[in-house]
Amino acid sequence: MKKHGVLNSEIAAVLASLGHTDTIVIADCGLPIPDGVKRIDLAVEIGKPSFLDVLQVVADDMAIEKVTLAEEVINNNAEVNKEIELKLIEPAFEYVSHEQFKEHTKKAKAIIRTGEATPYANVILHAGVIF
């Protein structure tokens, strides 16, 4: 049994398979998941698990080069936006419209659906390298 890091076998497998610039999405429970993109559904009830809890665990186990967020999060969920900025200090940040964000999710290796039920609590994580 693993002692640390991501214990969820599906998430661990996706993280292990990422190459430089590949993307994964951590999403609230309302983000549409495009056909053909791997869905890892963690939602058990509204709010559980939280977006920020899942983000923290994934970020601790992933080299992240860039982060993409919907620009709407700035005005509609400033608290989550601030927490993302505090948790992810190193990567570059990019803000796009929510419609563009949804288009970008079509290229993700996986979308991790949380129980989060606050507006625009979604992030695209772009894989970096560890060297």
Curated annotation (Swiss-Prot):
Active-site residues per Swiss-Prot or TrEMBL entry: 20 (proton donor)
Claim: Secreted is one of the keywords in the record: no
SUPFAM superfamilies: RbsD-like
Pathway: Carbohydrate metabolism; D-ribose degradation; D-ribose 5-phosphate from beta-D-ribopyranose: step 1/2
Top EC group: isomerase
Main location, first listed in the record: cytoplasm
EC number: 5.4.99.62
HAMAP family given in the database record: D_rib_pyranase
Subunit structure: Homodecamer.
Record's protein name: D-ribose pyranase
Chain's gene name: rbsD
